[in-house]
Amino acid sequence: MAPAVFTSDYWKKYFSNKKKPTVKNTSDIDLLHINRGRQPFDEGLSINEDSFFYRHNIHVPRIVYLIIVACGSFIITGGIEFAIAYGMYKKTETSVRLWRLPDTLSGDAAVTNFVQAIVTYWVESILVQGDLRSGLVKPIYFGWWPENFLLREVLRAKPRYHFKFIVFRWMEWLVFVGLRGLVWSVPLWFLFWPATVGILCAPGRHEGNDYYFNNYPAPQVFKLIFGGGEGFVLTPWIAFLHMYMYGHYLHVAKNQKSLPKTSDLEQQRGTSSSQPSENDANITALPKPEPKMYENSDLTPARTPVTPAPLEKPVNLAPEVVEPTNAAASPLQLNAPKLTDVDDSALAYDPTKVQDGEDRFVHNDVPLENAENPSRFVHSDAPIDMTHTTTVISEAQNLPSTLLPQDGNAVHHDTDAPSLSNVRKSVDSPRVPPSFSDDAVSSFSLVTAPSINNVGGSTAPSVNNQEREYDYDDTSSRSSTLTERPVVH
């Protein structure tokens, strides 16, 4: 089985930022450390805020880390450069010279400077970011970030990927990191190359305008020292840059919640007197909203409570009441006929004798149980616990749905009941007391149900404060109560 380094999953965590913790994705990084059971970035190393190391972000573990990185790079880079020089100069036929081609040490040092800077940036970018994610070293934050666009791009830790395919993303990353390594190779060249050329003039054999060296071991030792020296300086510098970039991104991520979340300029008007935010002096803090706007303000006129003017005449919202001629009648009595002149005990409903224009109340001795159509009576299996019920009946429609049988209200209406028009025509005027005029009666149509609180053997209910008896058989009285509901026109 191939080692893990040759698998694509091993390299995806370095070259792909998809579903992986990155420098800017601090939440995923913290979650990763929590899952591993370790403190991220080793925050517990320095807890004394007054110490020199804490105030200047200089921790001994960081210094030790940079020294280890520098020494390791010196050994590795120096060994690689020694091997390259051995293969280049050991078996050459001509002497190695300082300036002239083909075997020139000055040209070799210049090329080594640029190539080594690019390769070192590639390798250290992977290793240092891995150490920062694992918590091996803590990032550094100095509270300053460059405003120059070029410097901000050079200090960018991750590229802006434009492709999804992993191979293209590798290429983007290589170009991105290589350009930054090339940028840092320029100051490195001014630091190392002139001094190196001046030092090489001392051991060389001067002939004419050039200096000559043996094929071995002078060129190999020169490359070892030159490459190792550059690695000793450049590698910890690259590690420090990544620690600095990581610290800045982490600081921004921690303070994102305290920044204003709105960019509406209309809400920032009149905020010149407000203090700037502690995290960013360029962002103007929004004014704090008052708990109650315009309350107790001198600019706002006092609100005068509006009192409605008293009415000249009281408005009577009650239905129209027709006063009977009898002075002893109750003033609250509605325009319903008073059946006082008729023997109530002899009243029974005989549908066979009801015709158009005839009286529906007849005097006969037919018991209620022999009535063929008792649909004009309200059948209730239980006492109706109501004191007064008034329902308006319309001529154009049947009884409303509220009067149909409901749960807990045993009021039943038979669908075979006579039509309202026939019933209205069947009411005979002689049955109505002379105190009610035709105009007054026809203008108000009500159905009034009396209050029924007891069933069977109890006192008969009253209609319009008068006693009323009904014809019913013994069987129906034991099981239910039949109440006539007169229709008034």
From Swiss-Prot:
Location of this chain's protein in the cell: Endoplasmic reticulum membrane
Disordered: annotated segments: 260-312, 401-435, 450-489
InterPro entries: DUF2456
Pfam families xref list: DUF2456
Cystine connections: none
Superkingdom of source: Eukaryota
Residues bearing the modification Phosphoserine: S27, S263
Residue numbers bearing the Phosphothreonine modification: T26
Compositional bias per record (Low complexity), positions renumbered to this chain: 477-489
Membrane topology reported for the UniProt record: Multi-pass membrane protein
Keywords: Endoplasmic reticulum, Membrane, Phosphoprotein, Transmembrane, Transmembrane helix
One cellular-component annotation, GO: endoplasmic reticulum membrane
Sequence ranges of Polar residues compositional bias: 268-282, 450-465
Keyword Transmembrane attributed: yes
Residues annotated as transmembrane: 63-83, 182-202, 221-241
PANTHER family tied to this protein: FUNGAL PROTEIN (PTHR28297:SF1)
Protein name, as recorded: Uncharacterized protein C594.02c
Upper classification of the organism: Eukaryota, Fungi, Dikarya, Ascomycota, Taphrinomycotina
